[in-house]
Amino acid sequence: DEAIFNDIQAYNDENHYQKPYTIKEVNGRQIAIIGQAFPYTPIANPARLVPNLTFGIREQELQTTLDKVKVKHKPDLVVVLSHNGIDVDKKLASRVNGIDIILGGHTHDAVPNVIEVKNNSGVTLVANSGCNGKFVSMMDIKFSGKSYTYKYNLIPILSSQIVPNKDMERYINKISDPYKADLSEIVGYASETLYRRSNFNGTFDDLLCDSMNNVLNTQLSLSPGFRWGATILPNQSIRMEDIYNHTAITYPNTYVREMSGETIKNILEDVADNIFNVDPYLQQGGDMVRTRGIKYSINPKQTINNRISNLRLNNDLAIKPNKMYKVSGWASVNNIEEGRPIWEIATEYLKTIERYKVDNTKNIDVIGEKDNIGIDI
């Protein structure tokens, strides 16, 4: 997720880049809406792309803003639009008083029911709508004096059943028409479902990793645990638009470098801690880094430096801490890479093999989560 602020002037009041809230009147009721940006933007993305901006989970600043809004505008309802993620939202709701509703989507988890979080001022309703326009959250509020009741529905969006808005359709066509030839080019075919969202892997990520290992001639590859990108069905053609749909970021360049076995393990441990840390405020988003060419075991309930074990190459030879291995990857956060963009690598690979078939060999052993129905590898 990237911050884009084209042609927006700095908002100077109390050092905010933009006004942190707005007031909307809905059916005669004053609704205060406060925005919460993704707190780890300069960590999960290159900090150089958001210079002079700061981000974070600032409970006291939010509480101060909320208190001022209540005094100045006396809203009937306070809503926070959040890019935090469901776990962070739940913790925030328990520690900041006066928020009625938090509507979020960062974790991309479609949560079917509202989560009621208790705090010192009462209860905050926390909802999460998923991603990619698959769902719309609808919350009906019925006021009775200063109190209210609510009804919540998570509505699935079936695009085939929706008539497009004509103005928006014309606008999209106007923007995309110059690129249609490139976007519609068929570069390969999928033998099975290519998707992104699993905790530890995704078959489209397997495609990207296999592309790097083959085109860049590396032993193993790393791909970020991004959560976005539309699924491709079995026997469906893979177009350039599909490749861009999973890779279109402003730092797409690939890299090849030698890494020690110790460095490889440290990378896996660091990413795992960002995901599985017991403190939601230390979870920085995304799913586990995707890998090809290696096998490992992971215990999410362990602490940092103790989650990853039994790290091996695909031929079952142990990865040794002091031995060097040839590694490829893309979307480097800390370095400006000079390699070709990942979409060029994936396209070259697909044009060579024509049809991509996923190797379903189990390379990741998840320990201690046998009864967790949310784990899918």
Residue ranges of predicted features:
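Acidic, metal/ion-coordinating pockets
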Residues: 1-159, 199-211, 275, 357, ...
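Catalytic centers of hydrolytic enzymes
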Residues: 50, 57, 130-377
